[in-house]
From Swiss-Prot:
Residues 1-28 are annotated as: Disordered. This is Small ribosomal subunit protein bS20. One of its GO terms (cellular component) is small ribosomal subunit. It comes from Listeria monocytogenes serovar 1/2a (strain ATCC BAA-679 / EGD-e). Keywords: Ribonucleoprotein, Ribosomal protein, RNA-binding, rRNA-binding. The lineage of its organism: Bacteria, Bacillati, Bacillota, Bacilli, Bacillales.
Length: 84
């Protein structure tokens, strides 16, 4: 446990950001999994789930969770699955 006041604050903010990032990342992965499942079953709502997953990926990029090229690659793969 840190003794310096600023270090104590950094630990607290790191925990807050870590939990926020974890929930954001989890939501992104969940959206991708839902789309994958819908695309595999040729569900009617696959297009809507694709849009939702794309939004989650873009949001993760803007928050610094993933690299923009990673998001672009994932979106490209999702679009290819949607087209099939």
């Amino acid at each position: 446990m840190p003794n310096i006041k600023s270090a104590i604050k950094r630990v607290k903010t790191a925990e807050t950001r870590n939990s926020r990032n974890a929930s954001q990342r989890s939501a992104m992965r969940t959206a991708i999994k839902k789309f994958d499942e819908a695309a595999a079953n040729n569900a009617d709502n696959a297009k809507d789930l694709y849009v939702e997953a794309s939004k989650k990926l873009d949001s993760a990029v803007s928050k610094g969770l993933i690299h923009k090229n990673n998001a672009a690659r994932n979106k490209s793969r999702l679009a290819a699955k949607l087209a099939k």
